[in-house]
Amino acid sequence: MIEEIALSRGHEIVGIIDPTLVIGDCALVIDFDSEAFRSADVAIEFTTPLTAKDNVLRAWAHGVPVVCGSTGWKPEELKVESLELKEVEGKKLIVDSKTGKTMLVWSSNFSVGVNIFFEMNKWLAEQMSRQPQYTPSITETHHIHKLDKPSGTAKTLAEQIGTEVAIESIREGEVPGTHEVKWDSEEDTIIITHIAKGRRGFALGAVLAAEALNR
């Protein structure tokens, strides 16, 4: 899906690194040490928490910046001299302090809709900071293949709320992703919900982030 969106927006894909594919099966299947990878302006990384950190470091070894949407790990784990961690609009950036070049853009969720949801969550949390009768909780539901729990998006929502928040994680079927933030009191309940209808929103957001990184 990322490939489809990138091509539709006029970008060239120089290669795909996927351990389930064998070099030679497809002209675009490459490895990190290939000339094609070294020519890339940016790499988009969506894998697992077990492989993401190493993938980022291998991309950096060739000077290629990365847009990373893999959750279950944190960019703070990347301790490289001259690189500085920043947070901008809910995303974590790693910037080379010597050149000023952004080498990593990481987000728990690149979906445009989810980032609007993040802003709604921050606003509601600010209002509720003056209403101690309400207790927050978060429920996140994803497909059975998702490894990390709670989801990175749920963790971001909890961090924005700023107080101790119970998070319920549900894994069922092929659910793309549903996040619900509930504020409950004896008098009433306030709920905000984001429901992903598929993976396209995540892919589009990642491509938009790659475009911004490469401007």
Residue ranges of each PLM-predicted region?
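C-terminal substrate-binding/catalytic lobe of Rossmann-fold NAD(P)-dependent oxidoreductases
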Residues: 1-37, 50, 132-215
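N-terminal Rossmann-like NAD(P) cofactor-binding module of classical short-chain dehydrogenase/reductase
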Residues: 43-44, 48, 67-68
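Short Gly/Ser/Thr- and charged-rich N-terminal loops/segments
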Residues: 28, 84-89
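Rossmann-fold dinucleotide-binding core
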Residues: 100, 104-120, 124-151, 160
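Rossmann-fold NAD(P)-binding glycine/threonine-rich loop
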Residues: 53-60, 69-82, 90-106, 112-126
